[in-house]
From Swiss-Prot:
Ranges of Basic and acidic residues composition bias in the record: 512-526
Region (Disordered): 502-579, 784-831
Keyword Transport: no
Ranges of Low complexity composition bias in the record: 787-800
Molecular function as annotated in GO: adenyl-nucleotide exchange factor activity; ATP binding; ATP-dependent protein folding chaperone
Residues with Phosphoserine modification: S533, S536
A biological process from GO: protein folding
Natural source organism: Arabidopsis thaliana (Mouse-ear cress)
Protein name: Heat shock 70 kDa protein 15
Known role: In cooperation with other chaperones, Hsp70s are key components that facilitate folding of de novo synthesized proteins, assist translocation of precursor proteins into organelles, and are responsible for degradation of damaged protein under stress conditions.
Amino acid sequence: MSVVGFDFGNENCLVAVARQRGIDVVLNDESNRETPAIVCFGDKQRFIGTAGAASTMMNPKNSISQIKRLIGRQFSDPELQRDIKSLPFSVTEGPDGYPLIHANYLGEIRAFTPTQVMGMMLSNLKGIAEKNLNTAVVDCCIGIPVYFTDLQRRAVLDAATIAGLHPLHLIHETTATALAYGIYKTDLPENDQLNVAFIDIGHASMQVCIAGFKKGQLKILSHAFDRSLGGRDFDEVLFNHFAAKFKDEYKIDVSQNAKASLRLRATCEKLKKVLSANPMAPLNIECLMAEKDVRGVIKREEFEEISIPILERVKRPLEKALSDAGLTVEDVHMVEVVGSGSRVPAMIKILTEFFGKEPRRTMNASECVSRGCALQCAILSPTFKVREFQVHESFPFSISLAWKGAATDAQNGGTENQQSTIVFPKGNPIPSVKALTFYRSGTFSIDVQYSDVNDLQAPPKISTYTIGPFQSSKGERAKLKVKVRLNLHGIVSVESATLLEEEEVEVSVTKDQSEETAKMDTDKASAEAAPASGDSDVNMQDAKDTSDATGTDNGVPESAEKPVQMETDSKAEAPKKKVKKTNVPLSELVYGALKTVEVEKAVEKEFEMALQDRVMEETKDRKNAVESYVYDMRNKLSDKYQEYITDSEREAFLANLQEVEDWLYEDGEDETKGVYVAKLEELKKVGDPVEVRYKESLERGSVIDQLGYCINSYREAAVSNDPKFDHIELAEKQKVLNECVEAEAWLREKQQQQDTLPKYATPALLSADVKSKAEALDKFCRPIMTKPKPAAKAEAPQAKGGEQADEGKSEPEQPASAEAMETENPAEGST
């Protein structure tokens, strides 16, 4: 089972994996930890990640970036409209009111949903993890911003499905940071709570989280955020400053040119980093636009002055986080700052003034989220044993249910009024389940919605659930228990609806028990009837309280000690009440979410595009192989291969290589994989024999020496007078001598043939044949010359009467064999 954490950032992504020795942030194919979150569509294939970033300057209109700003949001969203203005690619409104991204792919304009593009990026990250783990990756944990709505969270899950992933948890990025911070702390207090503020200033947003730590656990006390306050906003301030300056000085409008805008934004990002450590930063760009070189300079004070509108917004999420947590500045013990946008000195100055203490940077600002995601995945995985550490997460929004109800049936002349109740208040633990009781006579609907939309740029209504049809056996208003779940991903859904009906069953009880039971049933029935008589028809409670306790099916609690019932004549048949539970059909409508069929189609399209990418990569590899072979062989023919090919063959081969090189850059520039494979095989038919002759000349001497050593060794052993060979019969030794003579004669004959041949001729003596001859000689001679000495026969002791003692027959053999072992292996005996 894979344990992988993905930090899907607005600008860059990171992949962390859990191994037995800890958490590692793995490298991509370019040996970088950070992978750009860019998908570039080309005429023949897609370029994703680092390859996509490299293609952006040449193909800006088809390079899709900042996908997190688009996913799960309506096209009419004001924030989305502001973001679109700075994006070089085309985004339009789809038929469902959500954005569609347009790009030129395989020679035609195609439309993609943001979910599809995110799935492409996740598929690339999955490949990075699989390459490092050498195993398939399915289970994972993905970090998401705390401000993601229900629809955005569902969109991330759909994107993961498209990529072939199964997220065990969509964890808030600030929670992942807190987990990565706290799980390794060994000095956390056992009783008192250590309050730490985590401030994540990313590429496009600012998130604040206040967490309380105790030994072995963390509790999220509050979340706050600003969706549009990040590092890119400072880049945009610099971009607008220099764009206006260049418009006055050089009479060029950079904002009207996509490539020029990309180059200036990239330069402004570097400028921001320079200003974080220096009081002044110069800017120089050659041929920015209209063949004009531009230059400029900016001081840190000037940069901070033009950034005042952004800096003024920093305190709002800080104040809200403290307010929601019910803490003061003095209650916060430490402040941790992470994120790529946290390096602006003015930001740190504001944080220091607000908290009254210097923010700390004890964590890796870029990697902490991915590490926290991998740790959470390891905690959820059964294959990893992780230090005991509990994470108590809280939900950043308030969720309510709305329905038409509490009125009598239509025949009674009643009217239905819209009612609602908050089921999951802000700060509710994740996950959580609540149960509600409804009294209905027919099918009805429940709306899941946000209670407070002030912090949201999203429609209040999340989904609608239709419950029914159902039929009450008594023809009265039925009692239904509806279970609502806030799952681990922060997604709210109506999980089930159950029809509860009371039935009377006859059971044998004594007279005294019958009277007592009747009294209890009457009390219970009156209690059950109470909710129906009120104005409200809903009772909300934790789901764990809704299940009947053991032994209460008949409405009577089961006693701990059951007295033995004696059979008497006073037994009677008395009615008992039992609750019958029936599941009621439930249908779901999530506003803006992809349907199951649409997700399946997206999975198929992703498979087709991935196959096209793989074919093109293999084609490029084969083309590069042909090109590499041409250059390599041409150099070797003029150097070390020169003596191993005739002059006429070399000239013809060189001409053929030149012809193939010209073909590669002309007619063969855009061919299929099979054509390149055939072209390489054609060249190798001429080049391989030359290469073989060269390698044979290098290897032949060493293998001949090995065979000669083998012949001499066995021949000397066969004619030796050494006592250790005395037990070998002369006939056997003669066989060894004959084999040695035969091998030596074969080698002499082949060497004479080889010496008469020029280097460019086909070798008569191959190194492989010499190796085979040496192996055959060794295989024949070794068993003979290493035959062990026979065991010495010791005299058996004579028993009384001249008979040998039976028990002593096998005893002398052991020391004899041990002696033989010591003789043949003196090294072993000395250890």
